[in-house]
Every structure is written in C-alpha cells, then in structure tokens.
C-alpha cells in the first residue's frame, strides 16, 4: 500500500470502519466531526490527497462517493457509483406502501431499475424511494433511492427500513436494554422508541447502498 501520513491513515481507517459497520462510507462532515477537523473542507483536502496517492476514488457530486481501492483482497464491500457499461441487477422500485400490505406487493412497485451490482455493499432486494429529510445528515435525501436487503436482524448502528404500525420509516438502529431506538439523522426530527417485543415493529431490511436518480 502507498505510504500515507499519520493523518491520511486516520482518514483511510475511518472510511474503512464506516463501510464495515454500516455499508456506507462517511460524508465529509462526518469525517471532520470524528477526527476534529475545523470543517468539511479540511476533510475534503485529505480525501483529495488520498485520491492522488491512488488509495481511494472520489465520485463527483455524491456525498458518500468514496471508494477504497488499495489492498483489494481485504477491503470490505463498499459504495460506488454505477457504471453504465455494466448494468446487470434488476431491482424493483417501491414507491408508497399501503398500510398492512407487504412492502414488495405488486401494487407498490412503480418501475424496475437495472443497476451495477458493485454499487451496493451486498446484494439488495429492492429500491425504496425516500420521502422526507429525517436522514439528511446521513446523506440520504428526499427522492433518493435506498437499496434495501431484506433481513430479519440488524446490527446496532445500521440504517434500517422498519414498519411501525401502518408506516414505513428509514432510521439508524440503536439497541437499548428496554427496546430499540430509531435514530433520525436530522435534529428537526424526533427519534422513535420501540418497546421490546412491540407487535407494532417489523424490520423490513437494511440499507446496502444509495442511488441519486440523477446518477442513472
């Protein structure tokens, strides 16, 4: 691997840990906050230095468009942008979900996208159109397409899709002794507490990637 400065190594390791833990690389703001930089611009300077050394790739216009390219054999699966020449994976796009019906019910599927499999940290089952800004600070915005893998279990800190009664929501999972907390990544939105054993809660899946419609 190319020799990095101590600070560059910290940034590289932070990106790697974030991908291993959540399936997403961090945003510039998250790197700055974690490593004590004065601003996201400082994080951007370090990212550009890493890109010049050939250990990461940066995708223009994507807040989490960071791809590790050094030490390929031991890197975690990671987010990349789609490559137009490799469009293999067919994914249904889920729009609005009707109360009480399965998330992949035919009436919820508005269209199908062909995607590059390397876009995702692991193989997704569907795309969910994000509505609202509750996950803004995680780089997930209204209208984005969240790639979701169906799961019955999720790890602490992962971004999940959950059903709460008649609603479907995207939040970050935090386990507590008495239940679950669904964390909003936007101070304008309240977190949601779910009592242990609540029949109102059902895990629909975990986020394994993100697509901006403009990327197609």
UniProtKB/Swiss-Prot annotation:
Residues 28-48 bind DNA. It is an enzyme of class 3 (hydrolase). One of its GO terms (molecular function) is DNA binding. It holds the Pfam family Peptidase_S24. It catalyses: Hydrolysis of Ala-|-Gly bond in repressor LexA. The record marks 99-100 as: Cleavage. GO terms for biological process: DNA repair; DNA replication; negative regulation of DNA-templated transcription; proteolysis; SOS response. Its EC number is 3.4.21.88. It comes from the Bacteria. Signal peptide: none annotated. Keywords: Autocatalytic cleavage, DNA damage, DNA repair, DNA replication, DNA-binding, Hydrolase, Repressor, SOS response, Transcription, Transcription regulation. SUPFAM superfamilies: LexA/Signal peptidase (SSF51306), Winged helix' DNA-binding domain (SSF46785). The active site is at 134 (for autocatalytic cleavage activity), 171 (for autocatalytic cleavage activity). Represses a number of genes involved in the response to DNA damage (SOS response), including recA and lexA. In the presence of single-stranded DNA, RecA interacts with LexA causing an autocatalytic cleavage which disrupts the DNA-binding part of LexA, leading to derepression of the SOS regulon and eventually DNA repair. Homodimer. Belongs to the peptidase S24 family. This is LexA repressor.
